[in-house]
Amino acid sequence: MESQRNILLIGLLFVSFLLWQQWQTDQAPQPVAMESSSTIPSSSTSDSHSSDVPDADSALPAAVVASKELITVNTDQLIIKINPIGGDIVYSALVEHKLELDKDEPFVLLEQTKDINYIAQSGLIGRNGIDSSSKGRAHFDSASREYTLASGQDTLEVPLTFVADNGATYTKMFVFHRGQFKVDVDYVIDNSTDQQLQVQMYGQIKHSIKQSESSMMMPTYRGAAFSTANTRYEKYSFDDMADKNLDEKTLGGWAAMLQHYFVSAWVPPANDQNIIFSSISAGGQANIGFRGAVYDVAPGATQTINSEFYVGPKNQEALSAISESLNLVVDYGFLWWLAVPIYKLLMFFQSLVTNWGLAIILITLTVRGMLYPLTKAQYTSMAKMRNLQPKLAEMKERFGDDRQKMGQAMMELYKKEKVNPMGGCLPILLQMPIFIALYWVLLESVELRHAPFMLWITDLSVQDPYYVMPILMGISMFVMQKMQPMAPTMDPMQQKMMQWMPVVFTVFFLWFPAGLVLYWLVGNLVAITQQKIIYAGLAKKGLK
């Protein structure tokens, strides 16, 4: 009886977790001195707010130039298109990440079309800024309309130049790196005038407000996030932006837009005082970004202002190399402290077997093996409780409706027989955080996207196309249930729920990613094996 109740408890806990997650989804110092002593940043960021940053929505018809006028950059990882008006990144395709498994079309992250506006904008504002809401955007010149990272070339520089009316030259330099999704976006200001110039860099990500494509089975997040010196990682949804504009002063920091598996992020200099801001523009665009330190450029001096932009998959190693907290966009929730070592172990197994399906099997075997002592304690406790059932039934007849005497007698019996009535469910409660953490690792790991296993499973991140594994998983649950016959004293309602549990779980898992179903199926098979071994050992001790 205790075994069925515990299986029922697992089911209820898991379904409750999914429902809770879906509810969560729905509510869902001074800058350092520069190289030139005649060119210094101001002691603080500007007191102005994000209204200083130009609103691209109002200039959208002018900004969306013909495709032939865009500057195209090709690297081994990225296809980038830059608008010469402002130098905004208006298109990014990830070469090695396909849109669909059976097509050669690359996954497009940033794009600017009639229906979608998801771009990375940056510029210079302030007294002598070349981009502002009043002056409009700078029109840059480029030596070429197409740049390609050649074989044997590790970096590719794409310079855009603009000469202001006062004679000062502004160069917007994009630097691309082989094997990376990071782009260095730097401004070089050559002040050939006899007046001091004052500029402030900003970078923002503009995103059409769009509902998340998550479901109860795949609770993913689409929206913004940011980091400050005091807050390493915090989501800031489109609803949050509509309620309140973000305005956080910080040393360093970053601002990002997230979706399942992919992220775009602006990372300003870590040693500069920056302001992380957000807004909802008149055209219904969600914006999040940074405004950096104000720089004073003396006559005859040259100043470089740095920033980094990441546009690509949520690869933890690549993200950590840019900012120590940027890898937190791979969000494992409140059990991150368990999920991180599980992820590292999964990566280790993948390096050994070079197959993500086999790696999932190995980590499932490892986790189940580590939890075996708890599992054994659970079944031992349940066996002892079953042996006490005749005595408990006798007590029930003896004391009738006198619950106080019945409870006292039960406690004395448990103490005498050295049985913990909670011993059957406590191990399950201890195991659930590990199972949930592993669930999140498999759900959040971009490495599983389009990763094949074997036979008909060509993508572990999507559902089994023929529903074979969910059905096998349901059968394994049915076998586990039958290995422990239902006690006649079990409540009729519990019996009905137990009988339908394999069916309910099978229906749930029909739409789960194949990697998650594989984990659960292998876990059930291991549990069946462990159960047979434990029962054999208990039988030798006279426990049934």
Curated annotation (Swiss-Prot):
Oligomer and partners: Interacts with the Sec translocase complex via SecD. Specifically interacts with transmembrane segments of nascent integral membrane proteins during membrane integration.
Superkingdom: Bacteria
Pfam families: 60KD_IMP, YidC_periplas
Swiss-Prot/TrEMBL GO biological process terms: protein insertion into membrane; protein transport
Region (Disordered): 30-56
Record's keyword terms, sorted: Cell inner membrane, Cell membrane, Chaperone, Membrane, Protein transport, Transmembrane, Transmembrane helix, Transport
Biased composition range(s): Low complexity: 36-48
Keyword Nucleotidyltransferase (UniProt): no
InterPro entries in UniProt: Membr_insert_YidC, Membr_insert_YidC_N, YidC/ALB3/OXA1/COX18, YidC/Oxa/ALB_C, YidC_ALB_C, YidC_periplasmic_sf
Protein name: Membrane protein insertase YidC
Cell compartment(s), UniProt: Cell inner membrane
Any one GO CC term of the record: plasma membrane
Keyword ATP-binding: no
Signal peptide: none
Family: Belongs to the OXA1/ALB3/YidC family. Type 1 subfamily.
UniProt membrane topology term: Multi-pass membrane protein
Gene Ontology terms, MF aspect: membrane insertase activity
Role noted for this protein: Required for the insertion and/or proper folding and/or complex formation of integral membrane proteins into the membrane. Involved in integration of membrane proteins that insert both dependently and independently of the Sec translocase complex, as well as at least some lipoproteins. Aids folding of multispanning membrane proteins.
Transmembrane segments: 6-26, 345-365, 423-443, 460-480, 503-523
